[in-house]
UniProtKB/Swiss-Prot annotation:
Annotated positions binding Mg(2+) 2: D90, D93, D220
Main localization, broad class: cytoplasm
One Gene Ontology term of the molecular function aspect: inositol monophosphate 3-phosphatase activity
Name the UniProt record assigns to this protein: Inositol monophosphatase 1
Pathway: Polyol metabolism; myo-inositol biosynthesis; myo-inositol from D-glucose 6-phosphate: step 2/2
Organism whose genome encodes this protein: Mus musculus
Binding site for Mg(2+) 1: E70, D90, I92
Annotated GO biological process: inositol biosynthetic process; inositol metabolic process; phosphatidylinositol phosphate biosynthetic process
Quaternary structure note: Homodimer.
Family: Belongs to the inositol monophosphatase superfamily.
EC number(s) per entry: 3.1.3.25, 3.1.3.94
Length: 277
């Protein structure tokens, strides 16, 4: 039986490359930077242009599908997540990196049907790395098959996370306290590249053993989530329960063992869900 969503995935890869070219061109020029929810939550005209290109191109080809995009939600659209085929679009994951020309900037496209991940595309466009994952068919980077690491001993692990965009003192206290608790176990280290999607893809490559974060959004996770699971990894809530795309929090790890060990250390940050906004 033919794969009903392969054509969608192939089209998404083409569009991600086009978006990446737009971003690389924009990096050569001066940019207008605007502030969203906090002084560390930035948006540029390029974010909006790239999302408009992606949304309009996909809507023209698949008018019956649903769409959730970062900049559309920022402009006031509701996050309505149903069983219908739904595209999750983050035009520039790592906008602060983009603004500073720090070379980790990604286009993220996730596609879900019946609320299950079917495929994900993460194009780290400065690096020219195209990460893809298709349900039941594996995860790849530039055509090379990905496999998570086998390191389940947290004392020998390398984790990735972010400080996040909130600058509220209590939120920062929890974020830094969680990092301190994990480092004190001890572990080999914690790294940050400034984009949730690329952080998750690094788990899929085996370069990092796990990633955790609270305060991100569904469009940050929808593309990379299936890349992690198709590389042999797991997605889990930071409480140790099942992963919930709308919860704004995640552990993406090489194994249930490591994910649960991380969850044991984490203090939870109270967050409004994406589907409550």
């Amino acid at each position: 039986m033919a794969d009903p969503w392969q054509e969608c995935m192939d089209y998404a890869v083409i569009l991600a490359r086009q978006a990446g070219e737009m971003i690389r061109e924009a990096l050569k020029n001066e940019m207008d930077v605007m502030i969203k929810s906090s002084p560390a939550d930035l948006v540029t005209v390029t974010d909006q242009k790239v999302e408009k290109m992606l949304m309009s191109s996909i809507k023209e080809k698949y008018p019956c599908h649903s769409f959730i995009g970062e900049e559309s939600v920022a402009a006031g659209e509701k996050t309505v997540f149903t069983e219908s085929p739904t595209w999750f679009i983050d035009p520039i994951d790592g906008t602060t990196n983009f603004v500073h020309r720090f070379p980790f900037v990604a286009v993220s496209i996730g596609f879900l049907v019946n609320k299950e991940m079917e495929f994900g595309i993460v194009y780290s466009c400065v690096e020219d790395k195209m990460y893809t994952g298709r349900k039941g068919k594996g995860a790849f980077c530039n055509g090379q098959k990905l496999q998570v690491s086998q390191q389940e001993d947290i004392t020998k692990s390398l984790l990735v996370t972010e400080l996040g965009s909130s600058r509220k003192p209590e939120t920062l206290r929890i974020v830094l306290s969680n990092m301190e608790k994990l480092c004190s176990i001890p572990i080999h280290g914690i790294r940050s590249v400034g984009t949730a999607a690329v952080n998750m893809c690094l788990v899929a490559t085996g370069g990092a053993d796990a990633y955790y974060e609270m305060g991100i959004h569904c469009w940050d996770m929808a593309g990379a989530g299936i890349i992690v699971t198709e590389a042999g990894g797991v997605l889990m809530d930071v409480t140790g329960g099942p992963f919930d795309l709308m919860s704004r929090r995640i552990i993406a790890a090489n194994s249930i063992t490591l994910a649960k060990r991380i969850a044991k250390e984490i203090e939870i940050i109270p967050l409004q869900r994406d589907d409550e906004s």
